[in-house]
Curated annotation (Swiss-Prot):
Any one Gene Ontology molecular-function term assigned to this protein's record: 4 iron, 4 sulfur cluster binding
SMART domains: Elp3
Cofactor(s) needed for function: [4Fe-4S] cluster
Family annotation (Pfam families): Radical_SAM, TRAM_2, UPF0004
Segments crossing the lipid bilayer: none
Cofactor binding remark: Binds 2 [4Fe-4S] clusters. One cluster is coordinated with 3 cysteines and an exchangeable S-adenosyl-L-methionine.
Subcellular location: Cytoplasm
Gene name per UniProt: rimO
UniProt EC number: 2.8.4.4
Domain Radical SAM core: 133-370
Organism: Rhodospirillum rubrum (strain ATCC 11170 / ATH 1.1.1 / DSM 467 / LMG 4362 / NCIMB 8255 / S1)
Name of protein: Ribosomal protein uS12 methylthiotransferase RimO
Key words of the record: 4Fe-4S, Cytoplasm, Iron, Iron-sulfur, Metal-binding, S-adenosyl-L-methionine, Transferase
Positions of the TRAM domain: 373-439
């Protein structure tokens, strides 16, 4: 180990898209000879990649910056909260530099200034797939930046700009390198996966001798040829999403859709500037399940949005009862500085938000428990995430890492992370499954 090599620490907060930004920064720095330090003490400089979407996220970011300052003292701040440099420097005036999201060159330049690189031309420093912060067997694949929507509760377009898609060939090249490096599952992410390629007018780029359109359907079809799991996140419910379902039924991509519906009351959806045809959405969900019976549907919702009445909330509960989504997250509405929703009338009291959140989660818990119980006695493919002396923990095709449920295989210690195995489901609760290897004597 070259003792003269500079070491960089990183703290990555927020969503998987921010994690990919952190990976890109580290890949660039590693290529220049920097080592990645797992501790504050060992690092010559620390990068804090912040989240600035909610006030609670900003508070967490400021706390993380403060910890890095206390433990190391040489801190570069980037990410979504980096757009509010005044707030950061007011709380932590000693930070070395502050940059906004996706400003990789400025982050790298700040690192160069704080800890000039020591080059070693004889070392192959970076693996072909780049530096990743996830386990070896799965990786996030970011296909675009920014968003063209004007949802009133959100400031992502202000933080990350308008939609900017990557050419299909570049996405597929990265995906292929990840697969060759041993990644067994790709999680496709963006702010709006369905809108991929709109800014490029769905232009074609060459891939293995054939043109591939920068469009979600064609991209998914090409990713499906890699022979690994491909999971779609942040899918806005455009009509052409229906084209993806046959690919799931054919086994090209995982039968999993993460669609942020946000609410079911037409009045609230209109106030949010979201699609408001939830009756048609129920019909689409029924069609999807007819074409691909194994499809798992995940979504997120907001309760307590300004103007939400008890009747609006009941419409949401009734819709949930009909939709029977498999995996659901729910957030109590929180005002975001700069969001248009802040100007809306009829704010919902905090105690009402809390009460509705508990009612929502209780209702969804019953749905989840019922749907998971239907899997008992069936054999399901699972990917293994962890193995210890007690057994293995994995996930089904219907479960994404970190946000969905787990599958526990007690006593199965011979497996390894990344293994994909058939599992006989023996027990289920509201969120998780238990089972054993199928066909085992």
């Amino acid at each position: 180990m070259n003792k003269d090599l500079q070491k960089v620490g990183i703290v990555s907060l927020g969503c998987p898209k921010a994690l990919v930004d952190s990976e890109r920064i580290l890949t660039r720095l590693r290529a220049e000879g920097y080592e990645v330090s797992p501790t504050y003490d060992d690092a010559n400089v620390v990068i804090v990649n912040t989240c600035g979407f909610l006030d609670s996220a900003k508070a967490e970011s400021l706390e993380a910056i403060g910890e890095a300052m206390a433990q190391n003292g040489r801190v570069i701040v980037t990410g979504c909260m980096g757009g509010d440099e005044a707030a950061i420097r007011s709380a932590h005036p000693g930070v070395l530099a502050v940059t906004g999201p996706q400003q990789y060159e400025r982050v790298v330049a700040a690192v160069h200034e704080a800890a000039p690189p020591a080059h070693d031309p004889y070392l192959d420093l970076v693996p072909a797939e780049g530096i990743r912060l996830t386990p070896r067997h799965y990786a996030y694949l970011k296909i675009s930046e920014g968003c063209n929507h004007g949802c009133t509760f959100c400031i992502i377009p202000d933080l990350r700009g308008k939609l900017v898609s990557r050419p299909a060939s570049k996405v597929l090249m990265e995906a292929e390198k990840l697969a060759e490096a041993g990644v067994r599952e790709l999680l496709v992410i963006s702010q709006d996966t369905s809108a991929y390629g709109v800014d490029l007018r769905h232009g074609e780029s060459p891939w293995h001798g054939a043109p591939v359109k920068a469009r979600m359907t064609e991209l998914c079809s090409a990713l499906g040829e890699l022979g690994i799991w491909v999971r779609l996140h942040y899918v806005y419910p455009y009509p052409f999403v229906d084209e993806i379902i046959p690919l799931m039924a054919e086994g090209k991509i995982l039968p999993y859709l993460d669609i942020p519906f946000q609410h079911a009351s037409p009045k609230i959806l209109e106030a949010m500037k979201r699609p408001a045809a939830q009756d048609r959405t129920l019909e689409r969900i029924r069609r999807w399940r007819t074409i691909c019976p194994d499809i798992a549907l995940r979504s997120t919702f907001i309760v307590g949005f300004p103007g939400e009445t008890e009747d609006d909330f009941q419409q949401l509960l009734d819709w949930m009862g009909e939709a029977e989504l498999d995996r659901v997250g729910c957030f109590k509405y929180e005002a975001v500085a700069g969001a248009k929703a802040n100007a809306l009338a009829d704010a919902v009291p905090e105690e009402v938000k809390e009460e509705r959140w508990h009612r929502f989660m209780a209702a969804q818990q019953e749905i989840s428990e019922r749907r998971l119980a239907q899997k008992v006695g069936t054999v399901i493919e699972a990917i293994i995430d962890e193995v210890d002396e007690e057994g293995a923990i994995g996930r089904t095709k219907g479960d994404a890492p970190e946000i969905d449920g787990s599958l526990f295989l007690n006593g199965e210690t011979s497996l390894a992370p990344g293994d994909i195995v058939p599992v006989l489901i023996e027990h289920a609760d509201e969120y998780d499954l238990w089972g054993s290897l199928a066909g085992k004597d």
